Amino acid sequence: MNKSTLLIADIGGTKSDLALFNAGDIRTPQVQRRFINAQYSGVEEILVQFMATVGDVPTVACFAIAGIVSKHQGRMTNLPWEFNCAHLKGRFGFTKVILINDLTAVASCLKHLNPTNPSDIHTILKGRPDGGAVTGVVAPGTGLGEGFVVQCSRETFVTGTEGGHSDFAPVDAEQVALLLWMQKEHKTVSFESLIAGPGLARLYDFCKVYHTMGESTDVMKEMAGKVDRTPAIVAGAIASQPCPLCLKVIELFLRILGSEAGNLALKIYAKGGMYLGGGILPRLMGHVSFDGFVERFLNKGAMSPMLAEIPVTLILNKNAALIGAAGYLVEALSEDGGEE
C-alpha cells in the first residue's frame, strides 16, 4: 500500500468522481475516473471497481459527499447512501479516512486556484476586495451547496452547510406566482427545490404556463424519455438559436441564485468574496448574461453599497472539489487531525 498517494472521492447526487493524487501535487490527479451513481448500489461498489484499476492502493482517503456529515459518519441528501469511516477502513485497509461535506471540499479549493488562470476562475462582479476574513461559496448542482471559509490569523476554518434548504423568498410578482404554484404540490419550498436538481425542470414548467410560451420542438425531442431535463434546458438556452422558453428559465434561475448568493453574503459578512461553483454555471458563461444575477445579488436595500464591494467569482476548474478535498486531507495528515 502507498502512503504518499491520496485517494480522493467527490460523491455527488448524480455522479461520483474518484482520483489518485500525489501528496506533493494536489493540482494534478494521477488517475481519475467518473461513475454514474444510478448504476451502483453504493460507494463501496464504486470503490471496488476503481481500486481494481489503480494497482498500488493508497492507505489514506478523503470522501467529499453531497450530504450531512456528523463525526465519523455521513449520509447523502439525494441518495440512500451512507458512509462510516470505521467500516471503510476495515473493508479497504485504509489507515485514515476523512469524511467531509462536498461544499467543504469546494471551499477548501479556493486557495489552490490560480487567479490569473482563465481556466480556473472568471470574475462576475469585480467589487472592491479588502481581504476580508470570510469568503462564501454557493454551488448549484444536483443539490444547492453552500459553504464558507473563515481566516483567523494563521488559522483557517472551512465548512459546508445545508443552507440551500432554507425557505425560498420571492422578490417580485413573477416569483410570488412561482411560490404559490410550487405550494400547490410542496409543503415547503426551498431555494434548492428551484435552482438545483429538478429545480430547472420546475422553472421550465412554471414559465411555460406563467408566460404562456410555446415549447421548442428540438428541446422537446431532447427531453423525451429523460428523467433529468436540466441538460436539455441548458442546451436550449445556449444554442446558436436559443429556445426562448429555455432562456427565460435560465434568466429566472440566475435571478433567484443571485438573491440567495446575496443572502449568504450578508449573513456571513463575506468581505473576502463570494464564489460560485457547480457544473451548470460554467456552461452558461459566454452564452447567457449574468446581469440578472448581479442585479439580484446587489438588490438588498440599505446593504446594496456593501454588497457592491464584494467580488463575485465563478469557479471554472472542473476538479475543484477533488483538489479541495485533496488539500483538506494533506493538511489533516500534517496536523494528524481531521474527521476520521
Q: Each predicted region: which residue ranges?
A:
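A short secondary-structure junction signal
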Residues: 110, 147-151, 206
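Short beta-strand segments
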Residues: 62-66, 100, 135-143, 147, ...
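Short coil/turn connectors at secondary-structure junctions
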Residues: 3-4, 93-95, 130-135, 144, ...
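Conserved phosphate-binding catalytic cores of ATP/NTP-utilizing and phosphoryl-transfer enzymes
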Residues: 1-2, 48, 99-135
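Glycine-rich phosphate-binding loop of actin/hexokinase-like ATP-binding domains
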Residues: 117-124, 128-192, 285, 293-298, ...
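Active-site nucleophile and cofactor-binding loops and adjacent substrate-binding regions
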Residues: 35-38, 76-80, 98-105, 125-128, ...
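Short beta-strand-loop/turn "lid" adjacent to the catalytic site in phosphate-handling enzymes
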Residues: 54-117, 282-286
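ATP-binding/phosphotransfer module of carbohydrate and carboxylate kinases, centering on a glycine-rich
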Residues: 1-57, 177-340
